[in-house]
């Protein structure tokens, strides 16, 4: 049997659910302490970020080298994305990334934040701490909502 802590970690590592689902499950289904629920959810949510940030670029480069179709697609995607959002995003990109990851709604979070960092060319050394900070803030928000300390 897998421990509840490891189950919480795994749930938090999954896309879409992330810690937004892991914390309430850990608190109410597994009856973990607030501290355990928070720590295992945050760590589980941050864990895949490392691989996403490190390997998306390698995969896109590999595919671009192997296929003209992929090269055209990635060139189009990066050029379009960066040109379309360059003005406002460049000035506030660090703040944007933290806020985007910290908003506890579906389609925002560590997975999507990592994808955004990749698309905008934010290097790992900069993106990882920003996304981690956003995950910690999201963890605090979701924990407080789960405990009824913030009403939604």
Q: Locations of the language-model features?
A:
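Interfacial loop-to-transmembrane junctions
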Residues: 117-137
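Membrane-interfacial helix-loop-helix
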Residues: 1-8, 29-38, 43-101, 125-126, ...
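Transmembrane helix boundary and interhelical junction motifs in multipass membrane proteins
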Residues: 13-25, 104-115
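Helix-capping/transition residues at the boundaries of transmembrane alpha-helices
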Residues: 27, 117-119, 150
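Membrane-embedded alpha-helical core segments of multi-pass
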Residues: 108, 138-141
């Amino acid at each position: 049997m897998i421990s509840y802590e490891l189950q919480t970690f795994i749930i938090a590592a999954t896309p879409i659910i992330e810690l937004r689902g892991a914390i309430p499950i850990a608190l109410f289904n597994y009856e973990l302490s607030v501290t355990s629920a928070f720590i295992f959810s945050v760590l589980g949510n941050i864990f895949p970020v490392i691989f996403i940030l490190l390997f998306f670029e390698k995969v896109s480069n590999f595919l671009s080298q192997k296929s003209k179709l992929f090269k055209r697609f990635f060139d189009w995607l990066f050029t379009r994305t960066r040109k379309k959002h360059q003005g406002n995003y460049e000035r506030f990109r660090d703040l944007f990334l933290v806020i985007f990851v910290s908003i506890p709604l579906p389609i925002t979070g560590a997975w999507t934040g990592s994808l955004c960092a990749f698309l905008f060319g934010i290097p790992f050394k900069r993106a990882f701490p920003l996304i981690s900070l956003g995950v910690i803030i999201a963890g605090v928000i979701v924990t407080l909502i789960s405990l009824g300390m913030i009403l939604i």
